[in-house]
């Protein structure tokens, strides 16, 4: 007994000392404090999940510390709001480490409390010392991760059809355009926290309509004809908006899961506007739908083996999806398994899928200028995968900077190296330029031909236009307000020149103390204006700033009380034709 008491005393002293030691290293949540893990990465990875509001069953584990039903429910909500993005829905690990009970029970409550409170050099946020969690919440989470992970409900055809609504049947819709808007130059702007998109006339800068959608719309996509606008919220709700109506508005909607990010529509000749596809984070699957009603037709699971270790993964999330222009295929990128699926929709009853092994943690990407090659960031692998959609094979895996996040990227002709595609990064200040012409510039193809140095990490989107001589790079997740509130502009005719900084948030003229993060440059159809969202919290003022691309001067500011948390925006023509 004395020996046992001595060991317990030694363990207690060690645990008591650990917070002090870790706290010294990590209390200041800076890039240096986490050995290269930037605040931008933490902000990006620790995002909330709509699964926080879903009811789930509590399995009692007799080996775990006790929790009441109320405590379990509260902890589950915290987990899905702050932790699931890194550690996975089932706690099997995603971009973060697994938190399964075979690991957490061995660690014990006291160890886990220290780990949660003070973080880790690998990138775990210091939840308590940063003020994000109270000591009581840290104790709650330390006990929660020792319980069996609750499983969210599946979402099959029955559940989808229960949410499917055709608000205006196709036969009752206009047979011609019933408004005077220049549809090609309409912008669909996400109003993140209000669950809406603003349709804005790019010619007059007036709001056409505020359309109710799912929560935190991730992207807007256009049908091949340019008539229908598809938007998908993080809560997996898709809205179909008819731009031909006198006042463009919803004509159909559906939920395709519990959490999602991606939607697109068929573009191949003979299949224009016929099908839509959407992929979900949970359940891990994609669904093919009727293009003008959103009727669900076929659901395909993405659960399977990882591309590297060939281990089974129970929740590989569907990230970006794009439609090829010259044949009936969707390119579906599966995050955790690292697989790129070429889904041939010419006969969905006998579906043919080509599986291409790439790299784990696939996320977003875009076409090269020829629209033959699709480039997609494998963000936590620090790579860009290149798919040859003509030959249906992987063309290359390109090593880039830390956590590439291109949005759709940017295409332009480099003065020395020919056609390139560019991506910014969340984890560092670099902008990678990748050669994309294997025929006329073979030596530069699928290599980083130049790294530009931007303002800093925390970049989400990068953009240019065939008629522009500038490249715009945002940094909304950078911890330095001067950087997050401005954009870097590179001269494409002289890439050795230092970038120019445009003080977009300052130009917006917002008087309150909102964050004023500047996000997602987007050109108008003509390619002579660039739009930026100045994004603050929903109880603060936000705005859209329009810049003259030729002069790099302020052109106009769009302000309206209805512009609540504007983030991404998508010009109809450029989105329809994949111009970026």
Question: What kind of feature is each model-predicted range?
Answer:
Residues 165-181, 221-224, 263-272, 311-326, ...:
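Structural signature of eukaryotic scaffold interfaces centered on beta-propeller domains
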Residues 241-246, 289-297, 344-348, 389-393, ...:
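Short loop/turn segments immediately following beta-strands, especially the blade-tip
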């Amino acid at each position: 007994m004395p020996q046992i008491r001595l060991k317990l005393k030694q363990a207690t002293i060690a645990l008591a000392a650990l917070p002090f030691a870790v706290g010294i290293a990590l209390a200041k949540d800076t890039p240096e404090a986490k050995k290269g893990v930037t605040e931008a990465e933490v902000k990006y990875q620790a995002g909330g999940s709509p699964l926080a509001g879903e009811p789930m069953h509590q399995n009692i584990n007799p080996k775990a510390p006790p929790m009441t039903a109320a405590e379990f429910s509260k902890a589950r909500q915290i987990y899905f709001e702050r932790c699931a993005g890194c550690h996975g829905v089932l706690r099997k690990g995603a971009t973060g480490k697994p938190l399964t009970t075979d690991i957490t029970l061995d660690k014990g409550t006291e160890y886990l409390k220290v780990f949660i409170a003070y973080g880790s050099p690998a990138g775990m946020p210091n939840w308590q010392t940063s003020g994000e969690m109270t000591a009581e919440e840290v104790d709650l989470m330390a006990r929660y991760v020792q319980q069996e992970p609750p499983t969210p409900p599946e979402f099959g055809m029955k559940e989808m059809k229960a949410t499917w609504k055709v608000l205006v049947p196709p036969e009752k819709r206009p047979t011609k355009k019933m408004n005077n808007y220049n549809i090609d130059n309409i912008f669909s702007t996400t109003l993140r926290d209000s669950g809406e998109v603003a349709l804005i006339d790019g010619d007059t800068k007036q709001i056409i309509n505020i359309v109710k959608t799912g929560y935190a719309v991730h992207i807007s996509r256009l049908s091949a004809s340019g008539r229908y606008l598809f938007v998908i919220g993080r809560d997996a709700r898709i809205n179909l908006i008819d731009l031909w109506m006198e006042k463009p508005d919803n004509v159909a909607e559906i939920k395709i899961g519990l959490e999602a990010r991606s939607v697109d529509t068929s573009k191949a000749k003979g299949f224009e506007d016929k099908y839509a596809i959407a992929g979900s984070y949970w359940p891990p699957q994609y669904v093919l739908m009727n293009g003008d009603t959103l009727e669900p037709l076929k659901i395909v699971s993405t659960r399977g083996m990882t591309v590297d270790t060939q281990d089974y993964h129970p929740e590989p999330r569907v990230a970006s999806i794009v439609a090829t222009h010259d044949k009936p295929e969707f390119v579906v990128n599966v995050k955790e398994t690292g697989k790129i699926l070429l889904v041939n929709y010419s006969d969905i009853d006998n579906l043919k899928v080509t599986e291409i092994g790439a790299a784990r943690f696939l996320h977003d990407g875009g076409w090269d200028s020829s629209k033959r090659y699709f480039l997609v960031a494998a963000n936590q692998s620090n790579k860009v995968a290149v798919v040859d959609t003509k030959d249906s094979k992987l063309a290359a895996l390109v090593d880039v900077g830390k956590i590439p996040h291109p949005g759709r990227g940017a295409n332009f002709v480099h003065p020395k190296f020919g056609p390139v595609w560019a991506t910014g990064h969340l984890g560092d200040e670099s902008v990678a330029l990748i050669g994309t012409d294997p025929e006329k510039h073979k030596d530069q193809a699928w290599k980083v031909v130049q790294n530009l140095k931007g303002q800093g990490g925390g970049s989400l989107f990068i953009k240019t236009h065939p008629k522009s001589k500038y490249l715009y790079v945002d940094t909304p997740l950078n911890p330095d307000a001067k950087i997050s509130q401005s954009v870097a502009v590179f001269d494409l005719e002289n890439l050795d020149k230092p970038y120019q900084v445009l003080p977009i948030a300052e130009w917006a003229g917002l008087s309150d103390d909102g964050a004023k993060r500047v996000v997602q440059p987007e050109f108008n159809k003509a390619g002579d204006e660039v739009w930026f969202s100045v994004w603050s919290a929903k109880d603060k003022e936000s705005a859209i700033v329009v810049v003259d691309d030729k002069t790099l001067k302020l052109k106009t500011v769009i302000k309206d009380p209805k512009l609540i948390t504007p983030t991404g925006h998508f010009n109809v023509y450029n989105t329809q034709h994949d111009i970026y």
